[in-house]
Amino acid sequence: ARTHLLVLATVDGERHIVDVGFGGMVPTAPLRLDTEAVQSTPHEPYRITRHGDQYTLQAQVAGQWRRLYAFDLQPQAEIDQVVGNWYVSTHPDSPFMGQLRVARTGPGWRRTLGSGGVALHRTGLASERWPLADADAVIAELQQGFGIRVPAHPGLHAAIEAWLGSGASSSA
């Protein structure tokens, strides 16, 4: 099943992929499709390998190539994206159900929130990770670390505490 969407753009006769929705390892620049050469971005180097009609996007992390996902160029109907999005946002087996996941990039850094903790990755430095102990810490991180205005809601603290208590804090 297809649950992810890339944009294919042709600029000056050269095809590029653009991906703005892959979370923590999202490429932070368009990537040329028709080369297997290593491509620099403001963050990690990436490469796209091709095997027949199948492409694989990889990122170099700590000197190792890491497979992110595979894709092809088969056109997708809008309804296919609707069904895929519905599945990942509602099916009990979806890795996104019951989760709070946030990612943000900036010059030379990536910040992610998930699994009850925060990770900060800076280019050329060791990653930093820390747990979020309670709902107040999660809300403060969303506001200060990610620039998200968190609206007041009577059930918000309880929902975050339930998420933290469900095992979300097992790893950062």
Protein language model features and the residues they cover:
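Short beta-strand scaffold segments in enzyme catalytic cores
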Residues: 5-8
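Mixed-charge, low-complexity segments
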Residues: 1, 12, 17, 23-32, ...
